[in-house]
Amino acid sequence: MEISLGQSATVVRHVAETDTALAVGSGDLAVLGTPILLAWLEAATVAVCGSTDTQTTVGTRVAVDHLRPSAVGAEISCTAEVAEIDDRMVTFKVEARQRHNDQDVLIGRGVITRAIVARERFLAKLD
């Protein structure tokens, strides 16, 4: 698995009713739920890493600030960029932006760390 500093990926999602805080139980408003935003940011980190038949990455740490609400129907772009590689630990700078009034508005930012693991060895820990 080859991952390099500065490598990045962006995933684009549209907020659905099922993505709201009300729907996922993280609040009582029909706006993008923080757990969904976190999942989308993690998806961007996974897009950077990819995987092989023998290796993949798993999330180990998340520190994200959810800065602004987003309505159902909003288009959200989530970007992850490799900021640090320390042995098998890969740290990403992440951010989420929403197109609003012809501007890209920052709605979330933070840091996510993933560990490179051997698939079989990791899954053996379930036994």
Protein language model regions, located:
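HotDog/MaoC-like acyl-thioester-processing domains
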Residues: 71-72, 82-127
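A generic structural signal for short beta-strands and their flanking turns/coil linkers
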Residues: 7-9, 58-62, 74-78, 88-90, ...
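Hydrophobic beta-strand-centered segment that forms part of the acyl-chain substrate-binding groove
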Residues: 45-77
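Generic structural detector for well-ordered beta-strands
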Residues: 10-16, 65, 111-113
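Residues at secondary-structure transition points
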Residues: 28-36, 71, 102
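Catalytic strand-loop segment that frames the active site of acyl-thioester-processing enzymes
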Residues: 1-32
